[in-house]
């Protein structure tokens, strides 16, 4: 679950990087919330989109490892990988689905900027070809 301040930070990052996609990771508490929802997000860690593209994102593997190390040192877990879709709605593309295969159990948070004045943020669990939207 993402609180309003982290949600605002996520949207700000997407707007700052436009027209290119933004990307990063979210740290979460190591256990599910009391109400059975997704674990509570406690931190946002921006990453560099090495593709520098409005159509896709790439994060250098060494940067991913540094981010995960920092998250775990703080006593948290990797909960989500986030990025933006600068021209479309926040629904996983085939590229997202393919990439998610390497990160089972990690949520995919997508900021849709098809209308930059009214961004949409959605989160998904992607398992193989199955896409399940989860509550933010």
Give residue spans per PLM region:
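Metallo-beta-lactamase
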Residues: 84
């Amino acid at each position: 679950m993402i609180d309003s301040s982290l949600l605002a930070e996520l949207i700000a990052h997407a707007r700052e990087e436009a027209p290119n996609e933004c990307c990063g990771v979210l740290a979460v508490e190591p256990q599910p919330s009391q109400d059975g929802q997704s674990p509570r997000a406690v931190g946002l860690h921006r990453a560099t989109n090495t593709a520098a593209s409005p159509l896709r994102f790439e994060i250098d593997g060494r940067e991913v490892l540094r981010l995960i190390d920092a998250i775990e040192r703080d006593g948290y877990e990797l909960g989500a990988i986030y990025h933006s879709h600068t021209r479309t709605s926040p629904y996983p593309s085939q590229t997202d689905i393919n990439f998610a295969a390497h990160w089972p159990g990690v949520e995919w948070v997508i900021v849709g900027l098809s209308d930059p004045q009214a961004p949409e943020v959605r989160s998904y669990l992607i398992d193989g070809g199955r896409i399940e939207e989860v509550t933010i």
